Amino acid sequence: MSAKAEKIRDILSELERNSEVTNSALVSLKGQMMASALHKDIDERAVAAMTAALTSVGARVSDTLKSGKTGSIVISGTDKLIVLQQLSQAVLISLAPADAKIGLIDFEINAAIDKIKMVLG
């Protein structure tokens, strides 16, 4: 693992320690895993591919509806909350319990993104 990927993984682990986020990963817009703090029972390749696909669809929907640049995509399931937040050429995907406080999670995710941007340069 590269030094940058290791630093990003540390940021993701910190996000999970300091918030209700239970899993997180940084994925390229092309669907490649850049850094992961996903649990071992989660298929990283599938998550990376689906994250890229969801981000692409979200951007197309935003464009079609003329709603501006996509900020984040939130999927609310019965058991989990999934938040995708795009950086310039990557997407941070985070999972949390369905009853988690979305405002606080959003705040913590944005703080992690600021740190990741510093690592990526």
Please place each PLM-identified region on the residue numbering:
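Acidic, low-complexity cytosolic segments
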Residues: 1-23, 30-121
